[in-house]
Amino acid sequence: MAFLALGINHKTASVDVRERVAFTPEQLVDALQQLCRLTSSREAAILSTCNRSELYIEQDHLSADAVLQWLADYHRLSLDELRASAYVHEEHEAVKHMMRVASGLDSLVLGEPQILGQMKSAYAVAREAGTVGPLLGRLFQATFSAAKQVRTDTAIGENPVSVAFAAVSLAKQIFADLGRSQALLIGAGETITLVARHLHEQGVRRIVVANRTLERASILAEQFGAHAVLLADIPQELANSDIVISSTASQLPILGKGAVESALKQRRHKPIFMVDIAVPRDIETEVGELDDVYLYTVDDLHDVVAENLKSRQGAAQAAEELVSVGAEDFMLRLRELAAVDVLRAYRQQSERLRDEELQKALRLLANGGNPEDVLAQLARGLTNKLLHAPSVQLKKLSAEGRLDALAMAQELFALNEGSTDKSPQ
């Protein structure tokens, strides 16, 4: 086996380079087939996300330079430019790297779960392209198992490490069933987009996006089946909102105490969960003084994120140990599998010799031969034939002074000095 894992990621390459080395979903099947054809790779898979583009390859002989040249040519980059950002892992280190990636240990956000799904998609596309064989098939399954064990046996994925996810996690603590809740999101930037995605994934009943311009609110709302309104419509929406999360660039507060008091009266003081992620603040601090309002600021969330990141870093050490064990186990099984073909051929050869001697013995018995003599001849003949080829090779190795091979043969046949018969002196 000659196995390679190579590519670029957020730690080694700028966004500009990552964009140029990324593969679109439509390119992948053709790229995989071309990669195998032009680089003498027997098996290949490509993982391409916003933070990394990696190639997993099995070859007869390691040829990282040829693969890097292909990658540079495919994306019309200079080889020197690509080489400056690329990393190459071989054999055991390549297996370990692949398992670390799938477990979220190499991610921009430590322990993020999306990468495992992306790895599974890479495997599915490679199977579709016909570039997955015995090695990658086994390796992907071992990788998925290792990542699952990391998720199950460590706390690396349990605590949110983004402000958006932390906000949604706090909402889940207050509302046991988000599927019965309505959310009002104020703003339409990157953070609110992440909040909308997390809420949508949690099955929130209804999402309303309020923004200064209806066009931007509508673009975001369409992604998650939400409803778009203007900032001026917030008072009407507030009374129906169980969750309010705001993140705008406004220099003045958007929500005041009076508007929230009015909404609470209409809600008959049913609680409202509010998160103000904006700096400067979108929600007046006095709103937090109201009964039935749970108001959190960006600083509150940063404390949660920092504590959770510390927890994840502690869990990462245990996860690294699990990945190391998983990689070692895979390499051990792979080395054991390497003997399967040899053992199969040796068994077939032995069975052929056995059948030849057995047929000879049956003919002798049919012609009236003495059974004891026939059995003795069968045993001698089979022993001689089984030992013939090894004997010839051992004599040849001895004549060549290959003492290492002789020692290996002694170990192979479980021989030692005390096990051989010695003639009387």
Swiss-Prot record:
Pathway: Porphyrin-containing compound metabolism; protoporphyrin-IX biosynthesis; 5-aminolevulinate from L-glutamyl-tRNA(Glu): step 1/2
One Pfam family from the record: Shikimate_DH
Binding locations of NADP(+): G187, A188, G189, E190, T191, I192
EC class (word): oxidoreductase
GO MF term set: glutamyl-tRNA reductase activity; NADP binding
CDD domains: NAD_bind_Glutamyl_tRNA_reduct
GO biological process, one term: protoporphyrinogen IX biosynthetic process from glutamate
UniProt keyword terms in alphabetical order: NADP, Oxidoreductase, Porphyrin biosynthesis
Reactions performed catalytically: (S)-4-amino-5-oxopentanoate + tRNA(Glu) + NADP(+) = L-glutamyl-tRNA(Glu) + NADPH + H(+)
Coiled coil segments of this chain: none
Keyword Oxidoreductase found: yes
InterPro entries: 4pyrrol_synth_GluRdtase, 4pyrrol_synth_GluRdtase_dimer, 4pyrrol_synth_GluRdtase_N, GluRdtase_CS, GluRdtase_dimer_dom_sf, GluRdtase_N_sf, NAD(P)-bd_dom_sf, Shikm_DH/Glu-tRNA_Rdtase
Subunit structure: Homodimer.
Free-text function comment from the UniProt entry: Catalyzes the NADPH-dependent reduction of glutamyl-tRNA(Glu) to glutamate 1-semialdehyde (GSA).
Other known facts: During catalysis, the active site Cys acts as a nucleophile attacking the alpha-carbonyl group of tRNA-bound glutamate with the formation of a thioester intermediate between enzyme and glutamate, and the concomitant release of tRNA(Glu). The thioester intermediate is finally reduced by direct hydride transfer from NADPH, to form the product GSA.
Name of the protein this chain belongs to: Glutamyl-tRNA reductase
Source organism of this protein record: Pseudomonas putida (strain ATCC 700007 / DSM 6899 / JCM 31910 / BCRC 17059 / LMG 24140 / F1)
The encoding gene: hemA
